Amino acid sequence: MQFSTFQKNLDDWQGSSLIFGVLEEEIASQLENIKFVIDPKLLLKKVTQKKFKGEKGEILSFEFLDQNLETLFIVGLGKLKDLNKSDIENSIGNLVRKTVDKNEKMSILLPWEFINSQLEINQLAESVRLSAYKDNRFNKKKDEKKVLKEIEFLNLKKFENISFEETAQICEGVELARRLVAAPPNSLTPQEMSIQASQIAKDHGLGVKILEAKDCEDLGMGAYLAVAKGSDLDPKFIHLTLKSEGPIKEKIALVGKGLTFDSGGYNLKVGASQIEMMKYDMGGSAAVLGAAKALGAIKPKGLEIHFIVASCENMINGSAVHPGDVVKASNGKTIEINNTDAEGRLTLADALTYASNLKPDSIIDLATLTGAIVVALGNDVAGFWSNNDNLANDLKAASAQSGEELWQMPLQKSYKEGLKSHIADMKNTGPRAGGSITAALFLEEFFDKEIKWAHIDIAGTCWTDKNKGINPSGATGFGVKTLVQWIKNK
């Protein structure tokens, strides 16, 4: 999908489908703004008959047969005093999603004078594109309806030099993450994930290294390989590197959990644990690879960024890890596996150690790690933990800008008691209470304490069962926008 602007006199505009946003006040005067396509008095009569008030999310549609304009959508934006960019994005995005298969091009005219920055316009464009996203890769009969190819913004004179290039690049990263998460586990295997990562590297000039099981064994990655043992599919440890030209002012590592399917192992997932949905247990790696795609195109200055994914399956066979086994991670720590369904943190233990050995200034890991975070925060907000206040504040700022909600959780040190083992350095799970916190405390044991670190648990936010905001039902691509915005803010 492309974005464009029409900055000429509106009387010269031609198009077949127009979205017009109105506030919940003085509707008659606002309708004067579209007199270039229809008589405002006639339209006011029709609007009044429909008892349209311009309330938030209210939609009217009109079809015309005798003029160039075929369809007019009037969208209510609510009261001016309550106007915010999120409501605008959701209102316009929801409408576009409903009509995406009816138009190849849609034009949008809003009260731009109440939108404060070019960033907000870019984010609106981003929301429209992501709302219109469709994934029909696995349908026998491809959708033969129209495909929305272009969004045109009318009368953006306040922002006449606006560019949508980065917006499109970010959207492509989110869309990649969505495709990866939505792909069934017989399609997205560890091997396929490594192919996807290698393609990103090829397209954008990133360095790429794929470690095989023997390479990981040589590095002492006993925790990661213990998880992979139960699968007939070989694990793939993925490392992409984006290095800016010129002096490097900061080195960053982004680490994603990459379980392409999680059966739970011998602690088999049953009932409410939704084993059939465990294809999305690689949501963290999807966010990291989506960010790699976007940032590879954007090419931020002065940074060296490492994208790291320890990909494998957690399955059951005669070689699978047992509950009670003790394994050694690559930093030398021994771990008693008291729950084979807490496997993500085992793979991350070696991935974080690997990242730490690169001596970055900051590490951020993303993972669909715990059901406990879903109980705590639901499906709209991801929890995060950090050992550094500046990093935490920077992530909060990036979250607010990107529209992906984060909530900081405590690294409650007293809870480490629950990870103590009688026979090893630690267990991989603690008590049920505070489960997402003990998971974060576990991860904190696997990198140099001088490194700034944040862990983002996206278990509740990487998937939605129904259309919600800018997300069609299915994979959301959560995390890509926050990571990219955090990098761009540097």
UniProtKB/Swiss-Prot annotation:
GO terms for cellular component: cytoplasm. InterPro entries: Leucine_aapep/pepB, Macro_dom-like, Peptidase_M17_C, Peptidase_M17_leu_NH2_pept, Peptidase_M17_N. The gene is pepA. Keywords: Aminopeptidase, Cytoplasm, Hydrolase, Manganese, Metal-binding, Protease. Belongs to the peptidase M17 family. Its EC number is 3.4.11.1, 3.4.11.10. It comes from Prochlorococcus marinus (strain MIT 9215). The active site is at residues 269, 345. Binds 2 manganese ions per subunit. It is found in: Cytoplasm. This is Probable cytosol aminopeptidase. Mn(2+) 1 binds at residues 262, 341, 343. HAMAP family: Cytosol_peptidase_M17. Mn(2+) 2 binds at residues 257, 262, 281, 343. It holds the Pfam family Peptidase_M17.
